[in-house]
Amino acid sequence: MDRVLGCVFAGAVHDYFSGMLSVRNGGASVPNLTGKYLGAPVKHFMNALALVLLVLVGVVFVISPAGLLTNLTMDNLGESMNLDRGHTLVVWTTVIFLYYIIATLIPIDKIIGRVYPLFGALLLFMSFGMFFALLFEDKALFHSVGEMSFSKFFENLHPTGLPIWPLIFVTIACGAVSGFHATQSPLMARCMENEKEGRFVFYGAMIGEGIIALIWCMVGLTFYNSPAEMNEAINMGTPSKVVYDSATQMLGYFGGILAVLGVVVLPITSGDTSFRAARLIIAEFFKIDQKNLVKRLMIAVPLFVVGFIITKLDFQVLWRYFGWANQTTAMVMLWTAAAYLYRYHKFHWICTIPAIFMTMVSATFLAYAKIGFGLAYDTAVWVGVGLTALATVCFFTMLKPIADGDPDSETNPA
């Protein structure tokens, strides 16, 4: 339920406005947009936050596809070629990193633009394949869903009893709302030929991602007999094990391999552009021209060194940091879009309400989580409520609608 509502009313709205504001401002990056509509202090905060997020995206989206490809390799070639799992994982991690380096340095139409049609085909096969497998698989896959009532959607089924609020809204960091998408909007905005494409490119793409997320949510609910059983599978490796086991068992050997490759596409198509966007943000901040390959390497090499070091950390911890940074970026972008609508006398609540909600999610998570301040749950919730109220008051008191006839209103078509 949270994926559906979040995707339609928050995630897709977030993606649409981040994209269209970038289009209206000549392909401007998220930090520049936040600086224009929320002020310089927010721009500096967003520069740092976006950079952290992009590096974390690149790292977590190396680990998960490398794990899936390692499982494929070991199951098919491991015994016959006497392969070591650890060494195989290092090889795939290195291969993915090398691809990211090339994609970061080479113009977007030379590498990414050429391989994305193939990636898209794999993604479509994975999505439709898993969906129809859920419908027509012989075994009773829907046993756990069939027993659910509406009230059970609000029942906490976490094996260790962790609170639903706000953790679920940070754990589901991409299928409902994703601040990472805002960092990629300039790449798409600069490629668009007509503003009319925005609804399909930005809003529609997020709805598509939400559908894929729902398909895998159903797989998680039905493939395992209980949340505890799925959690045990995750603890044996990473979430990639759940993907691999379910795909190969539900679609057979060949279909499962194609589905796994389709899932591999998802993180790789995020990771390859994340380091590129990080390079561009740094170059923009320090005003380093990027036409020269040497100057690109000056930024890219340190980024990849830092990223490779971070891959050695625990995946679960990395995912929590990524989730928080992702949702906090979305929060700031939603406030930015709300500020644009509010200042130009538009119906701002379509962005303001999601912004308020995401502020409470991010603030409460940071206050409660062990990777944050580790406060008691009740205290953390009240901290989240207080900070959200403060942000809302600041929004309406510090921002002023632009008066009719103001010269700025003519340079920003409403």
Kindly give the residue locations of the regions a language model identified.
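Hydrophobic alpha-helical segments and their helix-loop junctions in multi-pass secondary transporters
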Residues: 58-75, 79, 87-94, 99-104, ...
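C-terminal membrane-solvent junction of multi-pass transporters and transport-like membrane proteins
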Residues: 85-89, 94, 108, 112-119, ...
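Extracellular/periplasmic helix-exit of transmembrane alpha-helices
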Residues: 19, 134-151, 203-245
